Curated annotation (Swiss-Prot):
Reactions listed under catalytic activity: an acyl phosphate + H2O = a carboxylate + phosphate + H(+)
Annotated organism of origin: Clostridium acetobutylicum (strain ATCC 824 / DSM 792 / JCM 1419 / IAM 19013 / LMG 5710 / NBRC 13948 / NRRL B-527 / VKM B-1787 / 2291 / W)
Active site: R19, N37
Name this protein carries in UniProt: Acylphosphatase
Domain Acylphosphatase-like intervals: 4-91
InterPro entries, per database record: Acylphosphatase, Acylphosphatase-like_dom, Acylphosphatase-like_dom_sf, Acylphosphatase_CS
Gene: acyP
EC number: 3.6.1.7
Keywords: Hydrolase
Superkingdom in the source lineage: Bacteria
Amino acid sequence: MMERYLIKVLGRVQGVGFRYFAQSLAGTYSITGTVKNCEDATVRIEAQGEEKNLNKFLAEIRKGNRFVKVEDIVAKKIPTADNEKSFKIVY
């Protein structure tokens, strides 16, 4: 079943390639949506896909990588977006 989440990511997530990291993971797990840096030093993600793929995506986001250090993730379900085809970085 298709789900969509609004996700706020806190930690060392700006200036470290996090948005590209998220975009790459989204491609791996067939996730559509957007990722954007926020003025409060967090990153906002809207992610849509099959629930099992979203769970894998979130688990990988939580792990981060050698540059990214995620301290917390806040996720809530939001209505799905029809006809969304890709995962984009928003500037």
